[in-house]
Regions:
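N-terminal loops that bind phosphate or other acidic moieties
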Residues: 2-146
Length: 146
């Protein structure tokens, strides 16, 4: 059981959380979003992210979903890997970049799984959610013609 933190460029993180609330009705307190404005100082961004991480982590575990690898939100998120929770326990953090809606839906659906399992299922959900629709139409057409 891990907390889930969405860290992305403004307004992506909060928009993703709003989408999850729309789909699931309500979202547990251990799932939050932090938007990173374009010109915010990285130190300020990190302090906001750290505060949110400490609020949502469960049993010292945290899954972070971020939008773009190498961008400020992902870089800020990576600094969480060396942090401790409020009890002084080193956080166990898994960070996934490339956030998409299927990834988020998978994370929310499996929110009570162990961190490693949650991260793997979430990653698979994000990858499986990327499709080329024309290719799918061809497959469906072929199946119908048989």
């Amino acid at each position: 059981m891990a907390g889930i933190l969405i860290i992305a460029h403004t307004p992506i993180a909060s928009a993703m959380l709003s989408f999850a609330e729309h789909v699931y009705g309500s979202i547990p307190e251990h799932i939050q979003a932090v938007d990173i404005p374009a010109h915010e100082d990285a130190k300020i961004s990190f302090e906001r992210v750290l505060t949110a991480a400490k609020a949502v982590e469960r049993h010292g575990e945290l899954l972070v979903l971020t939008d773009v690898m190498g961008a400020t939100p992902a870089n800020v998120a990576s600094r969480l890997m060396t942090q401790q929770n409020s009890s002084g326990v080193k956080l166990k953090v898994q960070i996934l970049a490339g956030l998409n809606l299927p990834m988020l839906m998978r994370a929310v659906s499996y929110k009570d799984d162990a961190l490693d399992v949650l991260a793997q299922k979430t990653l698979q959900g994000g990858q499986n959610g990327i499709l080329r629709l024309g290719a799918m139409a061809n497959v469906q057409t072929t199946e119908v013609q048989d």
